[in-house]
Structures are given as structure tokens and as C-alpha cells.
Curated annotation (Swiss-Prot):
Domain of life: Eukaryota
Annotated GO biological process: positive regulation of transcription initiation by RNA polymerase II; regulation of transcription by RNA polymerase II; transcription initiation at RNA polymerase II promoter
Gene3D superfamilies the UniProt entry points to: 1.20.58.1710, 6.10.250.2610, Single helix bin (1.20.5.790)
Any one annotated GO CC term: core mediator complex
Molecular function GO labels: RNA polymerase II cis-regulatory region sequence-specific DNA binding; transcription coactivator activity; transcription coregulator activity
Source organism per UniProt: Schizosaccharomyces pombe (strain 972 / ATCC 24843)
Family: Belongs to the Mediator complex subunit 8 family.
InterPro entries named in the record: Mediatior_Med8_fun/met
Function: Component of the Mediator complex, a coactivator involved in the regulated transcription of nearly all RNA polymerase II-dependent genes. Mediator functions as a bridge to convey information from gene-specific regulatory proteins to the basal RNA polymerase II transcription machinery. Mediator is recruited to promoters by direct interactions with regulatory proteins and serves as a scaffold for the assembly of a functional preinitiation complex with RNA polymerase II and the general transcription factors.
Name this protein carries in UniProt: Mediator of RNA polymerase II transcription subunit 8
Localisation: Nucleus
Amino acid sequence: MEDISTEKTVESLEAIRHRIAQIVQSLTHFLAILHQSESLSPWPTIHKNFNILLSQIHSLSNNLAAHSHTLQTTSIYPSLEFPVKEQEPLLTTLLRTKALPEVEEWEANTLQEYEASISSQPKKKEANDAYQKDQLWDQARIIFMEERENYSWFDFVTRRQESEGEFVSQRQLEIDRATEEQNANQMLTDILSFMKSGKR
């Protein structure tokens, strides 16, 4: 019974080791493609290799999940025939329980970048919203001025005023127009408020 259990454990570990070897090989190949020339590799090539790598990592994750109980309850140690002196660096690496310093540095940098991006997102969103609102108001003001020009059914004087001999000062009209343009934003607000509530 113990031999069967040991055999299953070895099979599980071999399957996981095979998956890891595939990932290492794919990563090496992917890096070679990325560094083979100064220009970026074609997008389909990058996409294909990335998908292969992604599927292999997914397969490894499934293997680890399927054999999680075996991995948690298995202790591995060198056999009596293991050449300890010749393979001491490998043995030290395999028995290491703490991450390498460069790995810890990568993790810390990644965490800092993630926290910085999360904290800056609300500020960017607020700035973007304010910019979009300003853009919207500018566009609305331009449309309002254009439409007002399209539907200006008046001249310097009306026909009735002309027939009755009344004339409007050109200078006063220009002053009134300049004042209207200065107050265009407020007028636009009043119009939108009226459209929403029906009240002046």
C-alpha cells in the first residue's frame, strides 16, 4: 500500500516537474524572440507565444491544485547515493525556504507600483471628468452660439421701425452683442435649467 502511495507521489511530482520544464523552455524561447532584433517582433508571433505560455501556466496551476494534498504531506530528501558534495549548490537551492533577494525586491517593487497606480486612479478620474465637463460646456456654448446665429430673425431695425422712422444705434447693438457673448455660459445654464424643469 505504501509503495502505491509513493508511486503516485512520484508521478505527481514528475508531472509537475514536466510542466515547469515546459514553462522554462517556453520562456527561454519567448525571450529569444523578443531579443533577437532591435525592432519589436510581429504582433501575431508575440501573441502566439504568449498564449502558449499562458496555457502552460494554467496547466501547471491545475496540476498544483490537483496534487495540493500530496505536496503538503510529502517530504523529499536526497537518497544515500546522492552526490552531496558535487551537487551542493543545487541542494542548497532546492532546500531554500526563503525567496531570493532579487525576487523579494521584484515583489516589493511590484506591490509599490500597484499601490501607486491604485492611489492615483481616483485623481486621474477626477481630472478626466473635470476636463470632459469643460469640453462639454465649450461644445455646448459653441453650438448654442451657432444656433442663435442661425435663428436670429432681426436686423438693425424692424420693418415697422423703418416705416415709422425709428432707428437703432449700431453701436448699441454691438455693445449688446458683446454683453450677450460674455454671459453666454449663464444663458446656457438658464436654458438647460428651463429645459429640465420648465421654470425660468
